């Protein structure tokens, strides 16, 4: 059947009138619906992290330390800071030496400090792998609740044992916790991430929502984004993965009774970086200033470094470096202790004590006059 031109034109006109305006295939929202969506998104962005802190159970017990698997969960670290500040008068801050890399939670420095005090006064806020550049960022952006407290902060000389550890090599070096170091200034020579990654890291520090989203990914989705998680778990409900239960710190295969000599570790000839040239020492000094600016009473513990592990020339250089560090602390009226070197068999490696080593270190601190007057508020004889 052949349509006349008039009929065909009439049909085409009717079709044009019925055409849907150009748009995507997604559901279209009206102006009012867009406003509602914007309100919901804004509420989630602003209130989500705070509400989640009330929903997700976080009730640490004695000797709590951030689980090793959650070392990159800075949002949870901030939450832990708030909890610790409400329960303890003294916070012990530092890297894996404070965290207790080779010992159980009840063999750490904070545990033995509490044992010597005969009460729970000291909280373990150490995190595995936190060199001074990263620790400074962690406390600046996620440790704001640490204010008006006693703070024992440990400086590990290992971070000055080479230009690489000091982040000064021009060749790219993938160090721990790059999101926490200064992204643009001062320049860190070995840090080569793209501008977009640096900018994203800088923004995340100031927007709690991003830290919260990272927390959810790390705790519940195996530290991968949701789209990839659903690909790896096609038959699982993502909501079912959100159990509201945080992992606990496990003490599996710690080998805490194996010393460095029993492990067959040889003496080292470390190529120490002078304090005046050291980036890590510079960042550590800035962290002391930050803690003081927040009205904290700061006490620095230098070491305990395994000097038994040093070859003669390296040992001589280390003693000079240690003296320069002490001189700076004295000039700037920073209370400190450089504890005596522990017996060789109480070290696991260059900087980590074994359980008995932590017990001895705690006793050394309680016998130190500066520690007594600064942290224990006990006057000298």
Where do the language-model regions lie?
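N-terminal secretory targeting modules
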Residues: 1-89, 146-147, 381
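Short, solvent-exposed loop/turn segments at secondary-structure boundaries
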Residues: 102-105, 311-316, 349-350
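Secreted/periplasmic serine-hydrolase-like ester/acetyl group-modifying domain
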Residues: 58, 170-294
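Membrane-embedded segments
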Residues: 84-187
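Histidine-centered active-site loop/cap adjacent to the catalytic His
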Residues: 349-381
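Substrate-gating cap/lid alpha-helix
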Residues: 305-338
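A structural motif corresponding to the C-terminal end of an alpha-helix
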Residues: 284-299, 328-335
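Residue-level recognition of beta-strand->loop/alpha-helix junctions
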Residues: 124-128, 302, 338-340
């Amino acid at each position: 059947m052949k349509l006349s031109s008039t009929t065909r034109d009439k049909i085409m006109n009717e079709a044009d009138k019925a055409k849907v305006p150009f748009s995507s295939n997604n559901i279209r929202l009206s102006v009012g619906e867009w406003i509602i969506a914007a309100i919901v998104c804004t509420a989630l962005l602003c209130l989500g992290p705070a509400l989640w802190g009330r929903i997700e159970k976080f009730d640490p017990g004695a000797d709590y330390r951030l689980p090793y698997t959650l070392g990159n969960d800075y949002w949870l670290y901030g939450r832990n800071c708030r909890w610790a500040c409400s329960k303890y008068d003294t916070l012990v801050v530092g890297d894996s030496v404070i965290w207790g890399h080779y010992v159980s939670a009840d063999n750490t420095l904070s545990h033995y400090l509490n044992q010597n005090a005969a009460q729970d006064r000291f909280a373990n806020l150490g995190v595995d792998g936190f060199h001074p550049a990263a620790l400074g960022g962690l406390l600046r952006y996620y440790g704001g609740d640490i204010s008006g407290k006693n703070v024992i902060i440990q400086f590990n000389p290992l971070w000055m044992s080479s230009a690489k550890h000091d982040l000064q090599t021009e060749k790219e070096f993938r160090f721990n916790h790059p999101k926490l170091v200064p992204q643009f200034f001062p320049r860190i020579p070995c840090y080569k991430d793209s501008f977009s990654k640096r900018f994203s890291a800088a923004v995340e520090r100031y927007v709690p929502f991003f830290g919260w989203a990272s927390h959810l990914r790390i705790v519940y989705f195996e530290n991968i984004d949701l789209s990839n998680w659903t690909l790896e778990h096609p038959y699982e409900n993502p909501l079912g993965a959100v159990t509201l239960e945080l992992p606990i710190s496990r003490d599996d295969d710690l080998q805490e009774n194996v010393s460095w000599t029993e492990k067959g570790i040889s003496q080292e000839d470390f190529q120490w970086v002078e304090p005046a040239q050291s980036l890590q020492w510079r960042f550590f000094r800035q962290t002391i200033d930050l803690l003081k600016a927040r009205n904290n009473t700061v006490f620095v513990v230098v070491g305990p470094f395994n000097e038994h592990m040093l070859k003669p020339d390296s040992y001589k250089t280390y003693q000079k470096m240690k003296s320069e560090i002490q001189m700076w602390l004295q000039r700037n009226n920073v209370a400190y202790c450089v504890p005596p070197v522990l017996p060789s068999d109480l070290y696991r490696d260059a900087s980590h004590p074994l359980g008995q080593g932590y017990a001895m270190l705690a006793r050394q601190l309680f016998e130190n006059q500066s520690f007594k007057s600064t942290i224990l508020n006990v006057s000298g004889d």
